[in-house]
Amino acid sequence: MGSGNWIIDNLNSALEMWNGRLEEIWQLITTSPENFKGGGIWNVIVGINGGLKAVGYALLVLFFVMGIVKTCGSFAEMKKPELAFKCFIRFVLAQAAVTWGMELMTGAFRVAQSMVTTIIDSSGLTAMSATALPDEMASIIEDVGFIDSIPLWAVTLLGSLFIWVLSLVMILTVYSRFFKLYIATASAPVPLASFAGQPSSSIGVAFLKSYAAICLEGCVIVLACVIFSAFASSPPAIADDTLAAATIVWNYVGELIFNMLVLVGAIKMSDRIIRELMGLG
């Protein structure tokens, strides 16, 4: 229900949009790919992964032959038992990776999700702290006359626009993590087949590093949300209530947007942060 003041209602609408996106992120980050959007997308991804296994098996032979040709200088070296055994073990392990790749990847994601759950439980948060307009700020805005309220319209419009844009950027980044998970899972048999040959194994290593980074992005996102929740629990204070109303509101909106920018920046760079911290670049 509106307050009857357009400026207050505009700010509250923007903050409700922000709080709604935070709640959505909190739910998404604890959701597994199998349950995302009812699991329909996951069923399609599983089917694609199964279809690409045939391609993976064909590439197994190709990468295996390429590896033997590049690592063996002559036909005589291929007859060495230790070399033949090493190549055989590599081929068997690569075949197992292609065959059981889905199970391995879902297992890795569950490990990352358990880390996310541990972070949430350790923080003591069950939900994100809502950001609300302080009562004293609402009182200052309500006491402003019509002429003096004109600058406030511009300030609140600009601030609300920033909050809406930041909300959309933040939620799109979290959604993109799911799409990266789906793309990596669907195409997994192809890069995993590269482990059959030693020269091509770098492709598989790079793929596993990228997948690990995608899974661990959730930890960075949760940590960023926990830190922001601490900021939101103590909203920006009104330093000097003798200033003009437009200046007070501008200072409040500016500090609020800065805190939001910190959260959005951390979420947006979660992939880069985890790669730098874990050496997965």
Label the model's feature ranges:
Residues I48-V55, F91, Q95, L172, ...:
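Loop-to-transmembrane-helix entry motif
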Residues M1-L59:
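Binding/recognition "hotspot" determinant
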